[in-house]
């Protein structure tokens, strides 16, 4: 039988043998991560580690390594995120400590508003580390959204309404902070009621409100107490209405273009309905 370790490149395997001699495979968690990413739980002595590798062209490992090296300290020092053990950017491999806990996305505890309060609290600490002003952020995103429109498969009338609206938007200087980029239960584990972060592969500097996009679309609509608990933990609601509207429109256009390109009819229809509601 082929082991998950056999999927590693020779260079990755050589590094792993040097870093964790005699390590044994405990669990393959690759299905919880993005396409092109291998995630393996290994045991070495009394300790467990998570090893991530990425296929050529997959940028998530570069982002995660940048996060580890400069921005995850508030979480790692509190035991709320793994610590970096070893890494080789060229070989596209990272070794980190393994966090105990069950995936939050499949845990019954994810229905507890306390988990969302913790999520808000952790995110506020992360965002508060730094901020920069960027005059080009909004104009560049608008140009990208306009370029995507022709590949969405949307009705001409809706495309024209979207184009007209986007070109009318103001382009204010934007405050960017370190963001996680995929802040939702699939990026968390729960250990006896404590939320921990397991994946930072979409780290980048963005507006703070970006990290609420997935929660708002999926979790907050299920139960408004989750939203209230999150904002309590965060200390405020960073979703300034006009900026939030622009983000929602651009995100929906991006998803529509992806769905049209890949043939996901249901997602395409949902994106169309979302955009019709946003730009009636």
What function would you assign to each model-found segment?
Residues 58, 103, 188, 205, ...:
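Conserved protein kinase catalytic core
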Residues 30-34, 86-90, 247-248:
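A short beta-turn/loop motif at secondary-structure boundaries
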Residues 1-27:
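Juxta-kinase regulatory segment immediately upstream of eukaryotic protein kinase catalytic domains
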Residues 48-97, 102-126, 225:
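A conserved alpha-helical element in kinase catalytic cores
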Residues 33-45, 50-51, 166-212:
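Active-site acidic catalytic loop and adjacent metal/ATP-binding pocket
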Residues 72, 123, 127-131, 216, ...:
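Protein kinase-like catalytic domain
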Residues 82-87, 98-159, 164, 170, ...:
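A cross-family kinase active-site recognition segment
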Residues 214-280:
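Helix-rich C-terminal or lid/interface subdomains of diverse kinases
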